[in-house]
Curated annotation (Swiss-Prot):
Pfam families: UPF0114. It comes from the Bacteria. This is UPF0114 protein in repA1-repA2 intergenic region. It is found in: Cell membrane. It is a multi-pass membrane protein. The lineage of its organism: Bacteria, Pseudomonadati, Pseudomonadota, Gammaproteobacteria, Enterobacterales. InterPro entries: UPF0114, UPF0114_bac. GO terms for cellular component: plasma membrane. Keywords: Cell membrane, Membrane, Plasmid, Transmembrane, Transmembrane helix. The chain crosses the membrane at residues 10-32, 53-75, 134-156. Belongs to the UPF0114 family.
Length: 165
């Protein structure tokens, strides 16, 4: 009976597979949004202000960061929880695949969230004259929360690797 339960629990990891497929679809939608932004800006480029162009570029950077986060979560999550990816040639295999444990994924996700929050904050600050002081204050507080959380997670991870647990 115990072996049956263990096999069922072990096999249940495949329930995460549709989640990773969903993230792949989300990545496709994000890619479409990226190109939509580029197509939107091309005809208006000569009439745009410098700050308007910077805002568009920040949006593209934001989409890129979120896309990178999605790829990292999809690949490492699949490899950690479902099955190892068997890429035949070393040239095609990403260097970090198969090397990230759950803690390193958490730290990379946290630092990616901080980077994404930084881009959002910068976009907000570039339009500061149109934004209320309360919105700016909340943006800064939320960003600081992300920074402190990421720093705390990194410290805890470092301490656990040194044996302070």
């Amino acid at each position: 009976m115990e072996k049956l339960i263990e096999r069922i629990i072990y096999a249940s990891r495949w329930l995460m597979f549709p989640v990773y497929i969903g993230l792949s679809l989300g990545f496709i939608l994000l890619t479409l949004k990226f190109f939509q932004q580029i197509i939107f800006v091309i005809p208006k480029i000569l009439m745009m202000s410098e700050s308007g162009l910077v805002l568009v570029v920040l949006s593209l950077i934001d989409i890129s960061l979120v896309g990178g986060l999605l790829v990292m979560v999809m690949f490492s999550g699949y490899e950690n929880f479902i099955s190892k990816m068997e890429i035949k040639t070393d040239k095609k295999k990403l260097g970090w695949m198969g090397t990230m444990d759950v803690n390193s994924i958490k730290n990379k996700v946290a630092s990616s969230i901080v980077a994404i929050s930084s881009v959002h904050s910068l976009r907000l600050f570039m339009d500061a004259e149109k934004i209320s002081n309360d919105q700016i204050m909340w943006c800064v507080l939320i960003h600081l929360t992300f920074v402190i959380s990421a720093f705390g997670m990194a410290c805890i991870d470092k301490m656990s690797k040194r044996g302070y647990s």
